[in-house]
Design a protein with these regions (language model features):
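Cleavable N-terminal export/targeting peptides
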Residues: 1-36, 50, 190, 196-201, ...
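Short loop/turn motifs that connect adjacent beta-strands in outer-membrane beta-barrel proteins
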Residues: 21-34, 67-84, 129, 158-164, ...
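Transmembrane beta-strands of outer-membrane beta-barrel proteins
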Residues: 33-39, 59, 68-70, 85-89, ...
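Transmembrane beta-strand segments that form the barrel wall of outer-membrane beta-barrel proteins
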Residues: 37-45, 68-76, 104-108, 130-140, ...
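Transmembrane beta-strands of outer-membrane beta-barrel pores
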Residues: 41-47, 65-67, 91-97, 127-129, ...
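Solvent-exposed loop/turn segments connecting transmembrane beta-strands
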Residues: 46-53, 79-81, 112-116, 138-148, ...
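Outer-membrane beta-barrel "beta-signal"
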Residues: 58-62, 153, 243-270, 443-455
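Outer-membrane beta-barrel transmembrane domain signature
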Residues: 140-233, 238-241, 311, 336-441, ...
């Protein structure tokens, strides 16, 4: 239950001073109510023998206000935030473990080690000399159930358009954490792989991260770090060595509202109600309206509500609006498994530059974000089981739609911002390229109708 609540919060929706530690996404956004979207690639040699180099695609959904921050894989609640002190509680993804379907010879016959979700508390003290921080973390996902404590320091400087941050940290990991990820159980032992427990130990981390402001809204980001693992982990029969290098490179777009936007009436809220059915159609044919059948054997359904806040209107002078959304979708599994909720957050672009726009506003929309299902939907579990592949509660969320203004159709000015439309609710594992998403290669599609209005 704790795991579900923590991950659900992650999807709810970063300040320049929001997070201490080695997080490379600190400071990408500026201002209250800012949001951003981007992608990054993590590159690191696997700690496991003969497992090669791991490339992990990270979808970046970013949000900041005075109380919470989201960095794609880390969300925090700011308990105290002053120029000198930051205290926050957070949940974050742990990038460790190995999947069930891509085991090197050194891990053959071993049970998979799941990635984890940590709940943590952080204290940071700032000054002209830099910042010192302490973090306490504990796995709440039921994967390792291990704990970690970090003590570190970072210094940040700005030069022209580039902001750079160097850091160092000590990380003490308890035996439960190390034994889970780098130990060998007695039942997994072989002639060349003895049973082993690394026990607790201290890691040493150093790194440098930077982001470059290409334009007012586009950002490039990158970083390098090195970790010296404890001797207990380094000596494990399934570990390739005690030193690990990591690299990260990516980009982000800042959708922060322009200064003065909506200052007279405040930023409005969009409300959307939706209902739909599962489909065997792939996403692209469904988007092109070449496949719209919802006649399936399972006959599962969805119903949901979504709330949106506009961030940009007429972006760059184009007929494009940007809206940030959070929503909840109820999955009716038609008795095939227990019904359950899923929550999502996304940034969505609406294009309305059609020749007939002055008469009947028509919008093409495309949303990109993250979805967390409290129970993996039946259609995903079934399809992945048939292929012998893992499932994940956390996946990328895509939301292509087309709608028309009800007010324009019926000549009602009051209903101009009320829309009737059709869309496809799609959960995707991004072709198995993301450890954050459980290395899932697959997903689910639901075709739905909706009504949306502005408050």
């Amino acid at each position: 239950m704790i795991r579900n609540a923590a991950l659900a919060v992650v999807l709810a929706l970063v300040s320049a001073q929001a997070v201490a530690t080695s997080d490379p996404l600190v400071g990408l956004l500026e201002g209250e109510g800012s949001a951003g979207l981007g992608a990054a690639v993590r590159i690191e040699p696997s700690m496991y023998k003969d497992a090669g180099v791991q490339y992990d695609l990270l979808p970046l959904l970013l949000y900041e206000n005075n109380y919470v921050y989201l960095h794609g894989y880390r969300l925090g609640l700011k308990l105290q935030d002053t120029p000198e002190t930051l205290i926050d509680a957070f949940v974050s993804h742990r990038f460790e473990g190995f999947p069930y379907d891509k085991l090197p010879a050194s891990l053959a016959g071993m049970a998979g080690r799941d990635t984890g979700t940590d709940f943590g508390l952080s204290f940071e003290r700032r000054g002209a000399w830099g910042a010192a921080f302490v973090e306490l973390l504990h796995d709440v996902s039921g994967a390792s159930s291990g704990s970690e404590a970090r003590l570190g320091y970072f210094y940040e400087w700005q030069r022209s358009r580039m902001r750079t941050r160097a850091y160092g940290a000590l990380a003490w990991r308890d035996a439960t954490l190390n034994n889970y990820y780098y130990g060998v159980l007695p039942g997994e032992a072989t002639a060349t792989r003895p049973a082993y427990e690394p026990g607790s130990g201290m890691n040493v981390d150093f790194g440098v991260y930077a982001d470059y402001r290409l334009t007012e809204r586009w950002r490039l980001l990158g970083g390098l770090s090195i970790t010296q693992w404890s001797k207990g982990v380094a000596d494990s029969p399934i570990v390739s060595g005690g030193t690990q290098l990591k690299a990260l490179a990516g980009f982000a777009y800042d959708f922060s509202p322009e200064k003065g936007a909506w200052k007279e009436k405040g930023r409005p809220i969009d409300v959307k109600l939706m209902y739909g059915k599962s489909t065997d159609c792939n996403l692209l044919p469904a988007m092109a309206l070449q496949c719209t059948s919802t006649s399936t054997v399972d006959n599962t359904r969805i119903a949901g509500i979504e709330l949106g806040r506009p961030f940009l209107e007429g972006m760059h002078g184009w007929p494009v609006d940007i809206v940030g959304n959070v929503g909840a979708i109820y999955h009716d599994e038609n008795g095939l498994q227990q019904n359950a909720w899923a929550v999502h957050a996304d940034m969505k672009a609406f294009y309305y530059g059609f020749p007939w726009d002055a008469h009947v506003r028509t919008r093409l929309g495309f949303g990109f974000g993250l979805s967390y299902a409290f129970r993996v939907p039946f259609v995903e579990a079934r399809d992945q089981a048939e292929r012998g592949r893992p499932t994940s509660k956390l996946l990328v969320y895509l939301d292509p739609t087309i709608d028309v203004s009800v007010g324009d159709l019926f000549g009602s000015r009051k209903l101009h911002d009320t829309y009737l439309g059709v869309g496809a609710s799609h959960r995707s594992g991004v072709f198995g390229s993301s450890q954050l998403l459980g290395n899932v290669n697959g997903g689910s599609n639901y075709i739905y109708t909706y009504v949306q209005w502005r408050m």
